[in-house]
Amino acid sequence: VTVDCSGYPKPACTLEYFPLCGSDNQTYANKCAFCNAVVEKNVTLRHLGKC
């Protein structure tokens, strides 16, 4: 599974809840929050859902 993070980072994210687990073992609330972390911290997707 991959997440397309082109167009990120964004200045603000919605409150939509669709959890993604990052390689830093942190659960991100949605694609926007995850993709911002990808750009800032070079995180990768571990799996969909909470960590």
UniProtKB/Swiss-Prot annotation:
Entries under CDD domains matching the protein: KAZAL_FS (cd00104)
InterPro entries cross-referenced by the UniProt entry: Kazal-type_SerProtInhib, Kazal_dom, Kazal_dom_sf, Prot_inh_Kazal-m
Glycosylation sites: 42
Keyword entries, A-Z: Disulfide bond, Glycoprotein, Protease inhibitor, Repeat, Secreted, Serine protease inhibitor
SS bonds (residue pairs): 5-35, 13-32, 21-51
Site feature: Reactive bond 3: 15-16
GO MF assignments: serine-type endopeptidase inhibitor activity
Record's comment describing the protein's domains: Avian ovomucoid consists of three homologous, tandem Kazal family inhibitory domains.
Protein name per the record: Ovomucoid
